[in-house]
Design a protein with these regions (language model features):
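Proline-centered helix-kink/hinge sites
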Residues: 83-84, 116, 162, 276, ...
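Short, conserved loop/turn and helix-capping segments at secondary-structure boundaries
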Residues: 97-101, 132, 136, 183, ...
Length: 345
């Protein structure tokens, strides 16, 4: 059911007139969700294999381009994207706006010059919690442009994706926006890849006794009660570039019927990230895993796109109503560090 559902639901279709611009598009996970909701997209991405993947599978065109402030974009009614998140990831060095990989000045500049009806970006949860000072700056700059800016931490598992994946979703608009409702039930690993687990014939993916021993030592030292295998009766752990492509202690792995354990293959990882089976990836295996690990789950993107469609069709608020909806950055109600920590960051 899950496989058939994503294969059909996420097929691109053109039913909307609004044009969507996807910045830092990656392989097209976010764009795929918007195309499935009926939008036309155009993307920009600096990684060649990801661009090739996007162009192989989507109706829109992705351009190989390293973006910078002042870049000349085509007209767009909606801007979406995933500004590089490495500076804020719990796995990164957390240098924030001092990091050259920070894409927010570019995203804000695009919004400033194109003035879309709606914008939406995805980033790691850590941006809103450990880096309140920078997130407030981003929201303040976007609010100055005349947008109501709202955000929420969403877990993809609550929207049909068979994976626990918390991400910060931020939306700017001039009307009203409702985040998608939580789905009734969670999709499990077994439902997503159960037909693949024991049919994959790739001996190179089988964990060696030495790798099993290394993992056992790691889990003992980290007080891990249950092995970090993927369990058929529950959703997967968060997929990352590191635990997909690397042979590490926290690698994504399944247990076979004969007791051996195996690393995931690309198609299994893609399913767990809600990419349809007809969606084909370009590049080496490592590059394909990186594309999957960095992507916005298309099924989550689709749910967000449907909500954006509702907002896009609403009349723009009058000035009085707009001012009543603007929320000061320090009233977001999130648990952050204190002012001293902000100044030291």
């Amino acid at each position: 059911m899950y496989k058939e559902y994503i294969n059909e639901t996420l097929r691109p279709r053109a039913t909307e007139r609004a044009k969507v611009l996807d910045l830092f598009a990656g392989c097209g996970g976010l764009s795929l969700g918007f195309e499935a909701a009926g939008y036309e997209t155009v993307g920009y991405e600096c990684e060649e294999a990801a661009v090739n993947t996007y162009n192989r599978n989507l109706r829109g065109r992705c351009h190989l381009q390293r973006l910078e402030v002042g870049f000349d974009y085509p007209e767009a009614d909606i801007i979406i994207g995933g500004p590089p998140c490495q500076p804020f990831s719990v796995f990164g060095n957390q240098r924030g706006m001092e990091d050259a990989r920070d894409g927010f000045p570019i995203f804000i500049d695009a919004v400033r010059r194109l003035r879309p009806r709606v914008f939406l970006f995805e980033n790691v949860r850590n941006l809103a919690y450990s880096h309140r000072w920078y997130f407030e700056l981003i929201v303040a700059e976007l609010s100055k442009l005349g947008y109501i800016v709202e955000h929420k931490c969403l877990n993809a598992v609550n929207y049909g994706v068979p994976q626990n994946r918390e991400r910060l979703i931020t939306v700017g608009h001039r009307a009203a926006f409702r985040f998608p409702k939580v789905a009734g039930r969670k999709t499990t690993v077994g439902e997503a890849i159960g037909d693949l687990i024991d049919t994959v014939r790739d001996e190179g993916k089988i964990l060696t006794p030495r790798q099993d021993e290394y993992i056992a030592v790691y889990e003992k030292k980290s007080n891990c009660i249950n092995p970090r295998d993927l369990y058929p009766d529950r959703p997967a752990r968060t997929l990352t570039c590191r635990n997909l492509a690397g042979c590490t202690s926290d690698m994504q792995r399944v247990r076979l019927k004969d007791g051996r354990r195996r690393r995931l293959v690309v198609r299994e990882a893609a399913r767990l990230q809600s990419f349809p089976d007809w969606f084909e990836f370009d590049g080496s295996e490592i590059k394909q895993f990186n594309q999957i690990g960095n992507a916005v789950p298309p099924l989550l993107a689709y749910r967000l796109a449907l909500q954006v469609k509702e907002t896009y069709g609403l009349p723009v608020m009058d000035e009085k109503s707009f001012n009543a909806h603007v929320v000061p950055a320090d009233l977001f109600g999130l648990e952050y560090g204190n002012t001293a920590e902000r100044k030291q960051a």
